[in-house]
Amino acid sequence: MKKIKNFRWWIAGLIGLATAINYLDRQNLPIALSEIRKTIVISDVDYGLINSIFLFSYGTMYAIGGRILDVLGSRAGYAIMIVWWSLSNILHGLVSSVTGLGLARFLLGIGEGGGFPGSAKVVSEWFPGKERALAFGIFNAGSSVGAVIAPPLIAAIIAVANWRWTFIISGLLGLVWVIVWLQIYTQPQQSKFTTDSEKDYISTALQSERDANPTKENRVSWLSLFKDRDVW
């Protein structure tokens, strides 16, 4: 297997692409809303409630997603999150009622809420502290990319097919991404694409950080977190 120089930056690009898909998926509903209303009766109140449902599940998962990823690991955990939100996105294209749309939106929020914690975990595993700001910037730039490409792409799909296909196609993009992810992602030291010098560089840098900042595991209650002003 041919090694790829500075493979960690390819990983940053890959999670940036996942973030772009994340934001593309969530833009489907507001952009396609006028077309959806030709099929499903959605009042302004209904639409506001649907958005609130999404934000509730998204915000909840955003808060606890990191813990779930710590348990599952970045490779499996991130893949599960993206499969979840991709299937939820496809579900939007299959519903025929406001209730179904609200359920699909709730499920989408659960999956997408784990996206940022997953990306952050990957960066912490592959990048020394001095490179993390740039790595965070690369994956976070995906949010802007997704938001920019969403309007013309969704409009084109609607023009060629219909609004249901905007959800189905963007959901399938996420599933294709997961296939690539599972083929290439492991921890740096087990990666078949990473050069020995890069493995040594990452390992040495991360170990130096741990040695310089030794920590002890302490259980922290949720209540104490909510009382901490820095959390807010």
Annotate the PLM regions.
Residues 139-190:
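Helix-loop-helix hairpin linking two adjacent transmembrane segments in secondary transporters
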Residues 41, 73, 94-100, 111, ...:
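Helix-breaking motifs and short loop linkers at transmembrane-helix boundaries and internal kinks
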Residues 186-220:
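Flexible cytoplasmic inter-helical loops of multi-pass small-molecule transporters
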Residues 60-99:
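Conserved MFS/SLC helix-loop-helix module at the cytosolic interface between two early adjacent transmembrane helices
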Residues 27, 55-63, 113, 147-148:
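Residue-level signature of mid-helix packing/kink "hotspots" within the transmembrane helices
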Residues 10-44:
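Extracytoplasmic
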Residues 104-143:
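Cytoplasmic helix-loop-helix junction between adjacent transmembrane helices
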Residues 5-14, 220-232:
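Juxtamembrane cytosolic amphipathic helices that cap and anchor the N-termini
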